[in-house]
C-alpha cells in the first residue's frame, strides 16, 4: 500500500515536471546577400541567439562588422567572393552592419531579447 502511494506520487510529480518544463524557443536563421556594395535587407525580425549568414555574391571581397547598441563591435573578417560568413546575435538592441573596406555598405536592424 505504501509502495503504491509512493509510486503514484512519483508518477504525478514526474508528469507535472515534464508538462511544466518549457523548451527554449528555436533560434531563427537569416540570410543576407551582398550584391557589389549593397546588402539585401530581408527585413530582419531577429532576437538574441538567432543566426545571420552573409552571402557574398559580389565579385569583390568585403569585411563586414556589426556594431551593437552598447558599442561592442564584432568583425566577421575578410570575406572573399562567393563565400558565406555566419554570426549568432549576442545582444539585444539596435545593430548596425557595415563594411570596413566599403563604408557605403550599411544595414540596420533591431534585436529583441530572448
Swiss-Prot record:
Tree of life domain: Bacteria
SUPFAM superfamilies per UniProt: Cupredoxins (SSF49503)
Pathway annotation from the record: One-carbon metabolism; methylamine degradation
Function recorded in the entry: Probably involved in TTQ prosthetic group biosynthesis.
Protein name (record): Methylamine utilization protein MauL
Organism annotation: Methylorubrum extorquens (strain ATCC 14718 / DSM 1338 / JCM 2805 / NCIMB 9133 / AM1)
Amino acid at each position: 500500500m505504501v509502495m503504491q502511494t509512493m509510486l503514484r506520487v512519483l508518477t504525478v510529480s514526474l508528469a507535472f515536471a515534464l508538462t511544466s518544463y518549457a523548451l527554449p524557443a528555436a533560434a531563427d536563421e537569416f540570410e543576407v546577400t551582398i550584391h557589389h556594395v549593397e546588402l539585401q535587407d530581408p527585413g530582419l525580425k531577429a532576437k538574441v541567439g538567432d543566426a545571420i549568414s552573409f552571402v557574398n555574391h559580389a565579385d569583390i571581397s568585403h569585411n563586414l562588422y556589426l556594431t551593437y547598441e552598447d558599442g561592442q563591435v564584432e568583425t566577421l573578417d575578410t570575406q572573399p567572393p562567393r563565400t558565406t560568413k555566419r554570426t549568432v546575435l549576442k545582444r539585444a538592441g539596435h545593430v548596425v552592419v557595415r563594411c570596413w573596406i566599403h563604408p557605403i555598405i550599411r544595414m540596420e536592424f533591431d534585436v529583441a531579447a530572448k
